[in-house]
A protein has these predicted regions:
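RecB-family 4Fe-4S metal-dependent nuclease core
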Residues: 1-173
């Protein structure tokens, strides 16, 4: 264990983020592994979509990579609850052996760890640029499932966008 509760800063264009990584380990080859502890119910993390739902590990990876000379060669979730104790990773990791559960989406991702880092970096930069340009499209990536776990219901405009899809009658014109 190299660090616990590691504070990292990341900035891209006009967006600045102060982040805190639960744990950073130094591996045998000198590279870093970042670990995020989760005590809630297990979820299927969405790290590979065009607009990834789960940005915490990708953001930690880009921030830690930017703030150190040591390469980041692994990102992991340490799931710790009454139902499950174990490590989850977006990629196969030879340094950790069979004790790691690999994301189901990893099977459809072409490329190794460097390709995933590049993909995450591009995805995050694109999202930041959209945010800064004022793009505020109401477009939940998983429809009702996304909305089910969202805490921003009172502020959301999803109902407005659903109403706009209702065809107008001649009386409305």
């Amino acid at each position: 264990i190299l660090d616990n509760e590691k504070k990292v800063f990341w900035q891209h264009s006009g967006l600045s983020l102060d982040l805190r990584i639960d744990r950073v380990d130094q591996l045998g080859d000198g590279s870093l592994a970042l670990i995020d502890y989760k005590t809630g119910k297990f979820t299927n993390y969405k790290w590979f979509d065009e607009r990834p739902d789960d940005l915490q590990l990708p953001l930690y990876q880009i921030a830690l990579s930017t703030g150190t000379d040591q390469p980041v060669s692994a990102t992991l979730i340490f799931q710790l609850n009454a139902e499950n104790i174990g490590l989850i990773s977006p990629m196969e990791l030879s340094d950790f052996g069979a004790q790691i559960k690999v994301s189901r989406q990893a099977k459809s991702f072409e490329g190794g760890w460097p390709a995933l880092q590049n993909y995450w970096n591009k995805s995050i930069h694109k999202l930041v640029e959209e945010f800064e340009s004022g793009l505020v499209a109401v477009a939940p990536t998983r429809g009702a499932t996304t909305c089910q776990y969202c805490d921003l219901g009172p502020l959301c405009r999803i109902a407005e966008s659903e109403q706009s899809e209702i065809p107008l009658s001649e009386e409305d014109i």
